[in-house]
């Protein structure tokens, strides 16, 4: 790792492209940014080797695997003599559901995003967490019940996943960057079949692809996220995709009014009237000004600003779930 390595504006633009679709080819990214294929390839490989890009991630619609609820639990860990261990926290959360993401925030809080198979009561989760961890540890609990809330904004219509669909899905979870030819070889099916299934999974809102950045490697930058609650959920159709009209307007304004920020839609909320956008910034005063302006948008009901210090993505349980459906 080079001590003097710093991201430049071109790197940030590439990060923005990968965050929206990390399976984009070097050629497509280069075409969008007026760069050569080799330039894009070199920059991406450097960001991976320097640890800036922590992980390429699949973003699944877990409703397709039978899950019904998304639950975010915010816990503030302490370092006093009687503080509980991280293992105690993880063990408790695993009894509630499967941990999809851990997000450590500036200030000492950690948000755990859980995917749960059954519908579950807010009070039940809260009381169980307080009883296990103590009231001083629990900050917030957010539940998103019903199928519609776990479906991403691109969700079109459900369909039954075949064994071949599941095998393709497993390959993509294990390696989101796997090539079509390699997947075809691994699964002993034609490249045409793999292409068709992948297109159907993406168009049906079953899978998207993004990246996770390592905040510790972003010298001079911070990862911050704005969680935006829009005023209404009237839905429009964009081709085969559905999206809240207000959400669409807000996203357009963000792109148009803040072109200096590499902006991507976060994959970790799927509610029509919520938008989670991730950004990179190096000027806290400018970030605060940007956040205040977002709050003033007429389409915005309220907004929250979060600064991430560490992100951990869990996928072992997804592989086990897919395997259980294949057996």
Language-model-derived ranges and their functions:
Residues 1-327:
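A compositional/biophysical signature of low hydrophobicity enriched in polar/charged and small residues
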């Amino acid at each position: 790792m080079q001590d003097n390595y710093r991201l430049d504006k071109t790197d940030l633009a590439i990060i923005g492209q990968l965050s929206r679709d990390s399976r984009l080819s070097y050629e497509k990214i280069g075409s969008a940014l007026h760069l050569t294929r080799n330039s894009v390839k070199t920059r991406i490989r450097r960001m991976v080797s320097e640890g800036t890009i922590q992980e390429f991630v699949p973003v699944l619609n877990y409703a397709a695997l039978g899950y019904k609820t998304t639950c975010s639990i915010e816990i503030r860990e302490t370092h006093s003599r009687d503080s509980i261990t991280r293992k105690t926290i993880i063990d408790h959360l695993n009894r509630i559901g499967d941990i999809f993401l851990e997000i450590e925030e500036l200030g000492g809080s950690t948000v755990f995003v859980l995917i749960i198979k059954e519908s579950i009561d807010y009070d039940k989760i809260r009381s169980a967490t307080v009883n296990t961890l103590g009231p001083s540890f629990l900050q917030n609990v957010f539940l998103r019940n019903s199928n519609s809330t776990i479906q991403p904004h691109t969700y079109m219509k459900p369909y039954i996943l075949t064994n071949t669909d599941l095998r393709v899905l497993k390959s993509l979870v294990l390696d989101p960057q796997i090539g079509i030819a390699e997947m075809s070889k691994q699964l002993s099916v034609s490249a045409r079949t793999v292409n068709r299934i992948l297109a159907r999974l993406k168009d049906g809102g079953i899978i998207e692809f993004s990246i996770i950045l390592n905040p510790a490697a972003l010298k001079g930058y911070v990862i911050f996220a704005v969680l935006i609650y829009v005023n209404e959920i009237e839905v429009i159709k964009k081709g085969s995709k559905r999206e809240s009209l207000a959400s669409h307007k807000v996203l357009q304004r963000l792109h148009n009014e803040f072109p200096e920020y590499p902006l991507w839609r976060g994959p970790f909320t799927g509610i029509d009237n919520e938008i989670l956008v991730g950004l990179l910034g190096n000027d806290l005063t400018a970030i605060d000004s940007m956040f205040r302006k977002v709050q003033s948008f007429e389409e915005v009901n309220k907004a929250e600003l979060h600064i991430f210090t560490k992100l951990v993505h869990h996928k072992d349980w997804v592989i086990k779930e897919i395997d259980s459906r294949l057996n």
